[in-house]
């Protein structure tokens, strides 16, 4: 029994998610080429902002991959690729054979319009390279370029084909591999592939038949080459280098692709059939399909082009058995469906698919009864009901046997005989005989036992002290009644006040799952925290369709006081996003208004306020008001009128301040009126002063 304290609340859910999705690795899924490969190719071979794919080699790999997959590209990109290839073909004689080789192949794939005179010049240059070189790569690029020009409808003949054939064959080794040139000490499997492809081009370009004895020798070399092939236990075959420098090492994908191109190209032009076992051709197809979606443009090209050569070749056409789904539900009564197609998903010839053996996860034989799968012609799928197989939840290996119905197809197609596929079966797990209770520590006498239903949340209420134990037990059984042991079974206790959590693994035996928590030994792990603990049970497994996280109720624990040096409960993690949540609402009550004075007092105060104005008016009446000194000239009269109007405006602003305006607004208006009054008042008073001075002097 293990305990863990202070885990976050999401820990149990995380464990259940892991249990639900962590299906043990099945055999690598082998599925035909699909739209997913087309999408991956379009992404991996993305054109740069200027519309190009890079150098000539990358451009050819892009357009060739798109051609095989049927991916439509923008006409502008095609035009730029054609222009790129045409410029290289028409360039000076200094262009290497490699560039001419790729440019000619780009032109062939895109059907670019190239002048016949340009091709004649390129052919002459490539033939000159063939005469002067002993390099396998130079010979490969030269004869490959000539073959590409010929395939575009131009008359190209290799006049000395036998000598070229012998020059390439002279670089072969006794184990079926090739050297890159006469000075190379090491041989290469990758070089063997390009050598075979070059030899097939020589045969196609020859103006007469190549020596049949030399072709027979090359066929024997191919058999030796396939003796060096490597394999996995699932029937996958691949080629890899043995002893080459790090700079020359290509990797299994590139090396296998080179051999597939070379062997299928040579088989297409050589008379007779190559003596290669069909299971090895099928294994190579499984290798390239097992890559899935490649991660680089180079791997994508090698995968797709190799599969295109295997799709239609004169050795054997591989037929791939695949399962659309490898997970089956006993609850839904899913059917076992099997597809047998070519690597690109084309329909297979008439055949039978039999299920001959079912193996358990421990390789134990479940059944050996042969069952023939029915064929659905409309959907091109073979199917079988899994209920009669009497298989339970878990992992199984199914062994299928494929047999062609027509004998002549056995020399054309490779089925591999038997094929093993891993599947995973799920179902509803029965949960019963669940009990929870408290027992004494010494005698083990159960004080209270409650039967609970784990198919739904329960609300048991228990109480215990540190001298007692908590007991929980239940049974799990599969749809066929066998004991089921899930990957994850946990009991969680969560302290209500401190939120500290404790997880315990619930051990299982052959009959039941049972856990006993002895609180006397757990007081320190519980940090001596008494109080209410919520109980939760988590049961999860990938094969269990009804995995659950179930609330059981709570238990009141009475634990002793913590000693002085006892460990403190861990601080609970603070959610960093909690500060962005809603804030606490602030409640504020304004104070009650002051008690207002009586009306009579208010009226009396108002009267006293108006008393100075009344006195002012009485004074004016006693003294008398006259306009004798009011200016008579137009300009001074205007300034005097504006001055009095400004004073009136100030008085009006004063009234508005008490009625409507605030202090800041009033001061703003008053500042403008003050400047106005100073100006017009100064002009009016200046006129009166000058008039008074004139009267005194007169």
Swiss-Prot record:
List all membrane-crossing ranges: 601-621, 639-659, 661-681
UniProt subcellular location: Endoplasmic reticulum membrane
GO cellular component terms attached to this protein's record: oligosaccharyltransferase complex
Keywords for this protein: Endoplasmic reticulum, Membrane, Signal, Transmembrane, Transmembrane helix
Q: Which domain of life is it from?
A: Eukaryota
- Topological domains (Cytoplasmic): residue ranges? 622-638, 682-698
Q: Please give the residue ranges for the topological domain Lumenal.
A: 30-600, 660
Q: Which residues constitute the signal peptide according to the record? A: 1-29
Q: How does it sit in the membrane?
A: Multi-pass membrane protein
A Pfam family in this protein?
Ribophorin_II_3rd
Chief subcellular location? endoplasmic reticulum
Pathway as given in its UniProt record = Protein modification; protein glycosylation
Q: Which GO terms describe its biological process?
A: protein N-linked glycosylation; response to cold
Subunit (UniProt):
Component of the oligosaccharyltransferase (OST) complex.
Function field = Subunit of the oligosaccharyl transferase (OST) complex that catalyzes the initial transfer of a defined glycan (Glc(3)Man(9)GlcNAc(2) in eukaryotes) from the lipid carrier dolichol-pyrophosphate to an asparagine residue within an Asn-X-Ser/Thr consensus motif in nascent polypeptide chains, the first step in protein N-glycosylation. N-glycosylation occurs cotranslationally and the complex associates with the Sec61 complex at the channel-forming translocon complex that mediates protein translocation across the endoplasmic reticulum (ER). All subunits are required for a maximal enzyme activity.
The record's similarity note reads:
Belongs to the SWP1 family.
Under what name is this protein listed? Dolichyl-diphosphooligosaccharide--protein glycosyltransferase subunit 2
Q: Which organism is it from?
A: Oryza sativa subsp. japonica
Q: What is the lineage of its organism?
A: Eukaryota, Viridiplantae, Streptophyta, Embryophyta, Tracheophyta
């Amino acid at each position: 029994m293990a305990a863990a304290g202070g885990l976050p609340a999401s820990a149990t859910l995380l464990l259940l998610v892991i249990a639900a999705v962590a299906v043990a690795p099945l055999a690598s899924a082998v599925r035909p080429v699909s739209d997913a490969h087309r999408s991956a190719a379009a992404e991996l071979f993305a054109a740069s902002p200027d519309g190009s794919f890079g150098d000539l080699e990358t451009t050819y790999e892009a357009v060739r991959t798109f051609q095989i997959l049927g991916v439509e590209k923008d006409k502008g990109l095609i035009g730029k690729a054609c222009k790129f290839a045409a410029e290289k073909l028409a360039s000076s004689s200094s262009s290497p054979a490699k560039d001419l080789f790729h440019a000619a192949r780009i032109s062939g794939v895109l059907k670019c319009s190239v002048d016949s005179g340009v091709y004649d010049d390129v052919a002459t240059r490539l033939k000159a390279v063939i005469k002067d070189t002993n390099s396998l790569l130079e010979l490969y690029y030269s004869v490959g370029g000539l073959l590409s020009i010929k395939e575009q409808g131009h008359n190209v003949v290799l006049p000395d084909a036998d000598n070229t054939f012998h020059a390439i064959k002279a670089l072969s080794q006794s184990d079926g591999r090739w050297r890159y040139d006469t000075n190379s000490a090491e041989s290469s499997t990758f070089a063997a592939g390009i050598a075979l492809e070059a030899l097939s081009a020589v045969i196609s370009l020859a103006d007469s038949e190549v020596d049949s004895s030399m072709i027979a020798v090359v066929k024997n070399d191919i058999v030796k080459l396939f003796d060096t092939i490597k394999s996995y236990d699932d029937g996958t075959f691949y080629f890899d280098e043995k002893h080459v420098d790090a700079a020359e090492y290509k990797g299994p994908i590139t090396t296998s692709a080179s051999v597939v191109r070379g062997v299928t190209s040579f088989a297409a032009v050589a008379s007779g059939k190559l003596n290669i076992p069909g299971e090895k051709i099928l294994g190579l197809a499984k290798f390239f399909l097992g890559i899935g979606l490649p991660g680089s443009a180079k791997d994508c090209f090698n995968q797709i082009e190799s599969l295109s050569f295997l799709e239609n070749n004169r050795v054997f056409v591989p037929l791939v058995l695949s399962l659309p789904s490898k997970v089956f539900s006993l609850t839904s009564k899913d059917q076992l469906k099997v597809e047998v197609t070519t690597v690109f998903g084309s329909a297979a010839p008439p055949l039978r698919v039999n299920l001959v053996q079912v193996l358990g996860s421990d390789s134990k034989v479940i059944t050996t009864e042969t069952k023939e799968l029915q064929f659905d012609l409309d959907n091109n799928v073979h199917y079988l009901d899994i209920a009669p197989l009497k298989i339970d939840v878990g992992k199984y290996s199914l062994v299928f046997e494929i047999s062609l119905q027509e004998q002549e197809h056995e020399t054309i197609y490779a089925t591999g005989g038997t094929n093993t596929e891993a599947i995973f079966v799920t179902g509803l797990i029965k949960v019963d005989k669940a009990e929870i209770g408290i027992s004494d520590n010494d005698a083990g006498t159960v004080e209270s036992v409650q039967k609970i239903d784990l198919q739904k949340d329960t609300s048991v209420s228990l109480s215990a002290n540190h001298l007692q134990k908590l007991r929980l037990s239940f049974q799990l059984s599969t749809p066929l009644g066998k004991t089921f042991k899930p990957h994850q079974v946990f009991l969680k206790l969560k302290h209500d006040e401190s939120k500290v959590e404790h997880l315990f693994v619930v051990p299982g035996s052959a009959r039941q799952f049972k856990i006993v928590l002895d609180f006397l030994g757990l007081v320190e792990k519980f940090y001596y925290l008494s109080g209410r603990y919520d109980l939760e049970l988590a049961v999860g497994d990938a094969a269990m369709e009804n995995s659950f996280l179930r609330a059981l109720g709570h238990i009141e624990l009475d634990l002793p006081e913590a000693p002085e040096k006892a460990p403190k409960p861990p601080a609970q993690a603070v959610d960093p996003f909690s500060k962005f949540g809603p804030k606490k609402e602030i409640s504020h009550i304004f104070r009650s208004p002051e008690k207002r004075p009586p009306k009579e007092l208010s009226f009396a105060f108002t009267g006293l306020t108006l008393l100075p104005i009344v006195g002012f008016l009485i004074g004016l009446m006693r003294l008398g008001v006259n306009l004798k000194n009011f200016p008579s000239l137009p300009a001074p009269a205007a300034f005097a009128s504006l001055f009095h109007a400004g004073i009136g405006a100030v008085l009006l602003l004063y009234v508005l301040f008490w009625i409507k305006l605030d202090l800041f607004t009033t001061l703003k208006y008053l500042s403008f009126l003050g400047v106005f009054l100073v100006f017009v008042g100064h002009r009016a008073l200046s006129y009166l002063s000058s008039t008074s001075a004139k009267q005194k002097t007169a």
